[in-house]
């Protein structure tokens, strides 16, 4: 199954229609929110280009586009922590994607943590923003996995 990605469509068709018509930004990317299918926890936020979205739909595994590396990558290609996609959704105007996954290896973050969202914004005694670890246990050692 290949995803049609027609760029232009009537607003009603985009918001209420049944045809996948992702609205990619000027760089050809769409934001992807990835959550754990069982717990609902946010694991990561990444980007997909047209090819990454098609590969994700066709393979049932999460593919993303790395802005820093300028290339497509399959989640888990280095770590072995592959994301098996159970559901894909788009938002109302199809400019964001939400995928629900089973996270292989238990960790989605390259830092070795379950989620990339392992710090909460709190305030110090003077009221300045301060980052506090939350659910920050490392499930693997990145130095050993990404050699």
Swiss-Prot record:
The keyword Transcription regulation appears for this protein: no
Cofactor note: Binds 1 Mg(2+) ion per subunit. Binds 1 zinc ion per subunit.
Keywords of the record: Amino-acid biosynthesis, Cytoplasm, Histidine biosynthesis, Hydrolase, Magnesium, Metal-binding, Zinc
InterPro entries xref list: PRA-CH (IPR026660), PRib_AMP_CycHydrolase_dom (IPR002496), PRib_AMP_CycHydrolase_sf (IPR038019)
GO MF term list: magnesium ion binding; phosphoribosyl-AMP cyclohydrolase activity; zinc ion binding
UniProt: Zn(2+) binding residues: 92, 109, 116
GO terms (BP aspect): L-histidine biosynthetic process
Pfam families the UniProt entry points to: PRA-CH (PF01502)
Cellular component aspect of the GO annotation: cytoplasm
Enzyme Commission designation: 3.5.4.19
Swiss-Prot/TrEMBL cofactor(s): Mg(2+); Zn(2+)
Catalyzed chemical reaction(s): 1-(5-phospho-beta-D-ribosyl)-5'-AMP + H2O = 1-(5-phospho-beta-D-ribosyl)-5-[(5-phospho-beta-D-ribosylamino)methylideneamino]imidazole-4-carboxamide
Main localization of the protein described in the UniProt heading: cytoplasm
Positions of Mg(2+) binding: 91, 93, 95
Pathway: Amino-acid biosynthesis; L-histidine biosynthesis; L-histidine from 5-phospho-alpha-D-ribose 1-diphosphate: step 3/9
Compartment(s) of residence: Cytoplasm
Protein family according to the UniProt entry: Belongs to the PRA-CH family.
Subunit structure: Homodimer.
Function: Catalyzes the hydrolysis of the adenine ring of phosphoribosyl-AMP.
Protein name: Phosphoribosyl-AMP cyclohydrolase
Organism: Rhodopseudomonas palustris (strain BisB18)
Lineage: Bacteria, Pseudomonadati, Pseudomonadota, Alphaproteobacteria, Hyphomicrobiales
């Amino acid at each position: 199954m290949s995803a049609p990605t027609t760029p232009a469509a009537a607003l009603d068709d985009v918001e209420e229609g049944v045809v996948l018509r992702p609205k990619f930004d000027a760089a050809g990317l769409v934001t992807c929110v990835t959550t754990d299918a069982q717990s609902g926890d946010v694991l990561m936020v990444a980007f997909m280009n047209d090819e990454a979205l098609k590969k994700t739909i066709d393979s049932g595994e999460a593919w993303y586009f790395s802005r820093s590396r300028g290339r497509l990558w399959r989640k888990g290609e280095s770590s072995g922590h592959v994301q098996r996609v159970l559901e894909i959704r788009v938002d109302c105007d199809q400019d964001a994607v939400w995928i629900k996954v089973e996270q292989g290896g238990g960790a989605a973050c390259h830092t070795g943590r379950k989620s990339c969202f392992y710090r909460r914004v709190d305030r110090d005694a003077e009221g300045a923003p301060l980052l506090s670890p939350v659910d920050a246990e490392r499930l693997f050692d990145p130095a050993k996995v990404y050699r």
